[in-house]
Amino acid sequence: QFGLRRDSDGIAFTVGAAVALNSTLTAEISGGLQHRSYVDRTLQDINAPVINAALVWSVSPLTTVRFNQQTGVIETAVPGSSGAFTDAATLEVQHDLLRNLSITLGGAYLATNYDGVRIRERGYSATARFDYRFNRWLALRGSYIYSTLNSTIPLSTYEAHTVLLGVRVNP
């Protein structure tokens, strides 16, 4: 057999709370610790904090602002690395133009640091989206996403423009 055996066992402990700060503002926060150990002993065990936060502000009955922040560990196939530590934050503003038409504008930031190797990635994205609801369970969604990733790996930095159009079914 060639390569590393990346099978792993992991556990995470988190505690958190949700609070209604007032009639228009709610917050959630949680924190804890994650541990992961690998079958292949050449991969180091990973211990990392896990922190999540969310803030939802109902500016008006038609407009909502959402902020989310998350940290964690993700799997990777990068040689010499047990995993990657991530930190992600998103901010979205959603506005209902009509009873069945909403638009959303948002932005995101992603930082990834690989354990055991000198690879660092920083990414940013901007999103514009519309949702047209035909009824309670059927909607048309269109999105434009601009994303960029800056990496310390040569030739891994990129920019992308993505346009999506689809039908959503929520039974």
Regions found by a protein language model. Name each.
Residues 19, 57, 95, 132, ...:
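Residue-level signature of outer-membrane beta-barrel architecture
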Residues 11, 33-37, 71-75, 109-113, ...:
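Transmembrane beta-strands of outer-membrane beta-barrel pores
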Residues 1-58:
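Acidic, glycine-rich loop-and-beta core segments that form the ion-binding/anion-interacting portion
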